[in-house]
Amino acid sequence: MSSRRKFIKSASLATAGIAVGNWSASAKSYSRIIGANKKVNLACIGIGNRGGEILNTLNDTGLANIVALCDIDMGAPHTQKNMEQFSGAKKFQNFREMLDKAGNEIEAVSVGVPDFSHFPITMMAMGLGKHVYVEKPMARTFYEIELMMAAAKKYSKVVTQMGNQGHSEA
């Protein structure tokens, strides 16, 4: 039987998913406490090529509810295929707009875009309290990595994971 906890474990081990951490039981966070068997509301940023593989792998777990899709090239055949498959998800071409307009519905994001975009997307998502799975490399410079590590400490309830396609089941 699939559960939210199994999804988290699988995602962490396979580095192809979103790891969603525990939430504290403080009064401020009661609205974020959810059941163990509830699906993770996921937004996928980058849904073609590698991003599409991540999207489908996460969907195949049965533990992710795909609520939003974002890709700059909505006209590409592989992107069109994924948009048709997840026709109920909101569609965006700009990740900032997606996080602004659909952010209240999103618990986690996957980042499967070209390398130069990993850092700004991950930082914005973390800053908004979203759990993040990002493909390698996390960022382009050591300074960007240091900023990400500082953000991970600052947003300690947000789980951030970097995956490596060569060591992933996706």
Model-identified regions with their sequence ranges:
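Short strand-turn motif at the edge of the Rossmann-like AdoMet-binding core
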Residues: 136-138, 162-166
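N-terminal glycine-/serine-/threonine-rich beta1-alpha1-beta2 phosphate-ribose binding loop
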Residues: 1-131, 143-159
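Oxidoreductase and adenylate-handling cofactor-binding alpha/beta cores
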Residues: 168-170
